[in-house]
């Protein structure tokens, strides 16, 4: 990874080759987005504009020729987040801005893939009686209709949230490269300090829980609003592991468990981030450790 980061920062030609080359490959576009973030974070928009403009050409081809806007959305989205992070130096603000980015993604995806999403939603509606069993039979006709109307917006929100996550991960990789080259160990301290305050955390929770009550289309807010909280939850785990000096094995176990049991660990991270916004686990633990060191605990 270090060799690739050094190659990207060697000059505009090298950076453009990586961004454009990765954007042309459907499974590596996230790597091109990370390269664009690295250039933007280090050199600013003026120097990065030419690199990004040429790198976006393959993404435009994917959209115009294959009706797939995802590569373009991630490249533009991660670059936008990089601009926010460079200007604010705040991961919390950047993660909150990613919610707006997710909403933009949902609009674009809804326009580009509406027939496919609606067809998939209809197939899911057909299997609901089998999936829910007796619970589905207990629902009234109106409740079944309302439940069915939420499926397409939720699917759109899930796809948008996935692209939102990829955009944030690309930014994280770009920031990690920047720290590796110019500020070793700086990224770890920066990431472990991420904590969404109580106010924004409650707003995100409201978007997830209350949003669907304002209409079926608002159901897409649930997955999109959860993304900043998940990253804050991961930062909390990293921060606590660092404070307790736990072996990296525990963090590896966390990510393996997250991949294997996503449906369980993902909401748990959301809950942890919300509670941390109210309690501040790391701050309390640091204060307790300081008291113990002073002989007061």
Regions found by a protein language model. Give the residues of each.
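Hydrophobic transmembrane alpha-helices
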Residues: 1-54, 248
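Hydrophobic core segments of alpha-helical transmembrane domains in multi-pass membrane proteins
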Residues: 31-39, 71-79, 219-230, 266-277
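Membrane-interface interhelical loops and short interface/amphipathic helices
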Residues: 108-155
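Transmembrane alpha-helical segments in integral membrane proteins
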Residues: 156-182
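Hydrophobic alpha-helical transmembrane segments
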Residues: 16-17, 49-53, 72, 95-96, ...
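Small-residue-rich helix-loop
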Residues: 181-235
């Amino acid at each position: 990874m270090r060799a690739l980061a050094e190659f990207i920062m060697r000059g505009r030609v090298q950076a453009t080759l990586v961004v454009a080359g990765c954007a042309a490959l459907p499974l590596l576009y996230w790597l091109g987005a990370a390269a664009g973030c690295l250039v933007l974070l280090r050199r600013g928009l003026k120097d990065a504009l030419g690199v990004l403009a040429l790198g976006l050409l393959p993404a435009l081809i994917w959209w115009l020729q294959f009706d797939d806007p995802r590569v373009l959305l991630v490249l533009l989205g991660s670059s936008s987040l990089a601009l926010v992070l460079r200007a604010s130096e705040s991961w919390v603000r950047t993660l909150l801005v990613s919610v707006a980015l997710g909403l933009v993604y949902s609009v674009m995806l809804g326009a580009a893939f509406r027939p496919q999403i609606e067809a998939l939603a209809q197939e899911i509606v057909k299997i609901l009686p089998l999936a829910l069993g007796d619970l589905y039979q207990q629902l009234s006709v109106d409740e079944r209709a309302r439940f069915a109307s939420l499926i397409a917006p939720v699917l759109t929100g899930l796809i948008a949230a996935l692209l939102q996550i990829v955009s944030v991960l690309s930014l994280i990789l770009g920031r990690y490269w920047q720290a590796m080259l110019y500020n070793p160990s700086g990224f770890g301290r920066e990431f472990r300090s991420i904590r969404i305050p109580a106010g924004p955390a409650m707003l995100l929770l409201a978007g997830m829980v209350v949003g669907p009550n304002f209409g079926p289309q608002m159901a897409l807010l649930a997955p999109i609003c959860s993304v900043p909280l998940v990253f804050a939850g991961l930062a909390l785990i990293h921060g606590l592991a660092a404070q307790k000096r736990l072996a990296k094995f525990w963090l590896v176990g966390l990510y393996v468990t997250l991949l294997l049991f996503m449906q369980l660990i993902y909401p748990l991270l959301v809950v942890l981030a919300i509670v941390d916004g109210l309690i501040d686990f790391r701050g309390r633990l640091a204060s307790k450790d300081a008291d113990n060191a002073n002989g007061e605990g």
